Amino acid sequence: MVHRIFLICIVISLIGLVQSCRPTRYIEKGDYLLTKNVIHINGKDSVYTGISEDALSNVLKQKPNRKLFGLVNFHLGVWNFANGRNPDKRFTKFLKEDVGEAPVTYEPALLTRSAEQLTKYLNNHGHFNADVVTQAWIDSSSVELHYFVNTGNEYKLRKLGKSFEDDSLKSQFVGNKNDALDKLKLRAGSVYNTDELSKERVRLTKALRDLGYCTFEKIHITYDIDTNIAGNYFDVIIRFRNLRNVSNISGVDSVTTAPHLKHQIAGVIVNQNFQVNGLKGSTLDSTYYRNYLYLSLSKPYVRPARIVRNLFLNRGDLYSQSKMKYTYERISGLGTYRFIDIDFEQAGTRQGVPQLDMIVNLNKAPKQGLTFETAGTNRSGNLGISSSVNYTNKNLFSGAEQFNWKVYGGLEWQNTNTSLEGNQNSVIRKTLINTYEYGSEVSLTIPDFLFRLPGRDLPRIKEPKTNISLALDRQGRPQYDRNLINTTFQWTLRLRDQDQLTLAPIDISYVQLEKTKAFTEQLNESRNVLLINSYSDHIISAGRLAYSYTTQDFTNALKNFYYYRLSFESTGNLLRAVSKPLNLQESKGSYLIDTIAFAQYVKADFEYKKYFILTRSSSYVIRLFAGSGLPLANRKALPFDRSFFAGGSNGIRAWRARAL
């Protein structure tokens, strides 16, 4: 506790020191430190607009220095602090370049550009009569920039039309029930928005490519927009253009047009020995499996049956961009290949329909790996060391099965101990190393649903996996020794890109505790039934269901996102129901397995995290966790391993795990 208070005092003193430095101390005469941008939208007029102040702030060309928690000018203060010191010192350079931030000075040219960008942004979002007036409020050596924005009324869509250069393409819209084509996002009443128009172009292009039009690109969609309509309305005509082919004949460029045609898959070729460097390898053997042609050296690296379950285009299918992308994602999810490329080649025509060969080139990753890790720890003055060896096999049975075997161990010297009441306990093992842990974990992950119903498939579900694991662990503490055996069988799957569902019908644990006499006496003296039951031998036979969701955008590392997880666990209820028919031993209302009362409870928890991205390497995270467990008839308390606690790397890090 003393260490924490000391650390907090240092942080407060550092912030005070940084703030005490005059922010404008290094601002040259005639320059002004930009302290604030203020955007005034429509003054006091009650003109409704969907434009937010944050959205407008993002387009400004000049922004003030960042502030810690939005209040403290920390980064500028650090820069000022380091600027007057020896620049050759590494620590000074680190403070100035990595932590600090140079003062942002006012530039009139950027103020003008910001006003232009605001006007452009408003025009792009349907405010064609927008007006922006700027003012610079100068005070001594600092300045505030004020933007007075009059958005005007929004322009809304009155009428939407379509125009086609090819009647065959038109047939995909007229009377077509395809949701991607029939339900356009653009409709009467929509506010003019260039971003939405671009998204509509992308969505329509994808929809047509999924229908077999592999030559169709975004450039083949253009918009004719008429804003000269009374009442703040506009009309749109979406034009679908044919292919443009440019040729040069006798030095003269000529452009010819051709209609877009649906393409069909003539065949699928899987090359499991593709050479990334372009060098030709040995002669490959060819094998046909379910209409797919496989090329490999003698025995295929991964069984064709496993690859087939991850291919979603077959001979005779129409080309589909979504199915091609899904195929790539599923093969990538196997974790067996380090290079994946899917290409299409023209293969003539069949009954007037253009044909494509789909070629899947794969280059395998190293099959086996061995890693060694070691770490030193210092938790509240308790020194320790831990090590682990991890063996990985990415293709154990030639079906992309991931096998992991981990052996680990750790030692720690706990020089103090706390009793149940929070007082210092003098009963400690007088050895240099009085805390240890060692064990082993074995897991096998199969990229499929093991034991699924015959003939049943879930093609829309992403990355179906079955995980089987076994763990053995022994912990030694000053108060007790603990032995754990755990085995788990679970399925995981993704319904969408951003969520995951986990179902574990089997999660069995056996925990044995060997308590010291002094610790046993402490438990008995506490008369706390909850603690006594928690620190006793127990058997857990659980079933678990969990769902998680995240809005993280992996294409935009600077975008804020959130994550939440819901979990429900039920233990011992089925076992309790069959205990009497099975004639299990009963003691004091609890049924026993080998003299141990098995756990019976229901438990639910919820976790929420909000990530505020500061830079590419730092973020501010808010975490909320709530849970509830209800012990049932067979046992009066939750087992120690399944009880709720705080502290540790996944909780409040200032305290050790289970210290709160």
Residue ranges and their predicted role:
Residues 17-20:
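C-terminal motif of bacterial Sec signal peptides marking the signal peptidase cleavage site
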Residues 127-131, 214-218, 383-387, 438, ...:
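Amphipathic hydrophobic-ligand
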Residues 5-14:
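Sec-dependent N-terminal signal peptides
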Residues 2-5, 22-333, 342:
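Interaction-mediating elements
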Residues 43, 147-153, 164-166, 238-244, ...:
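Flexible glycine-/small-residue-rich
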Residues 156-159, 368-372, 589-591:
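Short small-residue beta-strand/loop micro-motif enriched in glycine and branched aliphatics
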Residues 300-301, 320-565, 653-654:
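Gram-negative/organellar outer-membrane beta-barrel architecture
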Residues 281-283, 293, 377-380, 502-660:
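C-terminal outer-membrane beta-barrel translocator/porin domains of Gram-negative envelope proteins
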